């Protein structure tokens, strides 16, 4: 088996992507799988068309990597790849579209509104802030509709703070999503298919020292404490896993994805967002879930790769 790993790119998450790519290549090598890390450059399409790898595994993060564009090109090339197809990737990358689909399926997700920058400006920012504040109720979480690694994400507890949060989020995109903040236990649940159907790995519980699982808390060792498996009793853990599985299916994330939830003080799980290209760095969430499930990382990645190739052959 020969795998091309797509990593790098030009998004703000480039460094994280490169780290994920190197870690993935190292672990594949441990189980005897040949891989090559490639950047998404002007030579890539011709290279893939000529060399015809068995599989492409994209760990590209951000626009161009998770928004369905690369996935659509791979579909056109007829190359097997890990993760969601182009349409589902696009709809998951857009947090508002993903939440709408999840809500339509009857799954709980915090109340929200998405606002393009132009709408915010044209309709009088102060009036918009007042309306949103009254309708959604503080505290609120504001984040770019399209983006990852918690960049541009912040919490606000009053209208003045909401205005600052929106300015910060708009720095990362032309549309933001504002949702009601739910106090509880934050979880990341990795979903995989290793040839025996989809299954949820043990939830990883996230406890950030700052109280906010932002970019620094995600990638700087020591900023966040992770518990894998999460410190939940069996029934609550199962309810969270069931929701994550259903969300993964509704969004069509393929053989590998991650669903982020929060379990509130009444033990009810709420969908927050999902990732079509989970990070694989030393501090990333999915590798911790694999280890908690008893996998070696090399064997886990090998099984996902084989499942992705098998899935593609059945399409």
Map each language-model feature to its residues:
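Phosphate-binding site of ATP-dependent enzymes
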Residues: 157-236, 268-270
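Short, flexible, mixed-charge acidic loops at enzyme active sites
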Residues: 68-75, 213-220, 276
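ATP-binding N-terminal substructure of ATP-dependent carboxylate-amine bond-forming enzymes
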Residues: 1-97, 116-128, 306-315
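ATP-dependent carboxylate activation and anion-phosphoryl transfer catalytic cores
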Residues: 1, 233-315
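Hydrophobic beta-strand scaffold residues
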Residues: 35, 80-81, 109, 140, ...
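Active-site nucleotide/adenylate-binding loops and adjacent lid/helix of ATP-dependent enzymes
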Residues: 1-7, 50, 91-179, 183-184
């Amino acid at each position: 088996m020969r795998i091309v790993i797509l990593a790098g790119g030009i998004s703000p998450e480039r460094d994280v992507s490169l780290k994920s790519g190197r870690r993935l290549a190292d672990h594949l090598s441990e189980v005897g799988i040949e891989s090559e890390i490639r950047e998404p450059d002007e030579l890539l399409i011709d290279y893939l068309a000529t060399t015809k790898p068995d599989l492409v595994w994209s760990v590209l993060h951000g626009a161009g990597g998770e928004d369905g564009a690369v996935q659509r090109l791979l579909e056109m090339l007829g190359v097997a790849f890990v993760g969601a197809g182009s349409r589902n990737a696009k709809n998951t990358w857009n947090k508002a579209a993903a939440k709408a689909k999840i809500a339509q399926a009857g799954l709980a997700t915090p109340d929200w509104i998405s606002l393009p920058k132009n709408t915010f400006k044209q309709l009088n920012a102060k009036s918009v802030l007042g309306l949103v504040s009254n309708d959604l109720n503080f505290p609120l979480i504001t984040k770019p509709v399209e983006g990852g690694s918690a960049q541009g994400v912040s919490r606000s507890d009053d209208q003045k703070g909401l205005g600052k949060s929106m300015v910060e989020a708009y720095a990362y995109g032309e549309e933001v999503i504002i949702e009601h903040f739910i106090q509880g236990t934050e979880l990341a649940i990795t979903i995989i298919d290793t040839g025996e159907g989809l299954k949820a790995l043990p939830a990883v519980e996230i406890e950030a020292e700052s109280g906010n699982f932002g970019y620094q808390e995600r990638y700087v060792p020591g900023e966040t404490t992770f518990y894998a498996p999460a410190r939940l009793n069996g029934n609550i853990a199962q309810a969270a896993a069931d929701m994550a599985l259903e969300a993964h299916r509704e969004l069509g994330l393929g053989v590998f994805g991650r669903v982020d939830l929060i379990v509130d003080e009444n033990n009810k799980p709420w969908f927050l967002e999902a990732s079509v290209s989970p990070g694989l760095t030393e501090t990333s969430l999915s590798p911790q879930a694999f280890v908690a499930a008893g996998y070696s990382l090399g064997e886990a990645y090998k099984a996902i790769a084989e499942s992705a190739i098998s899935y593609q052959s059945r399409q």
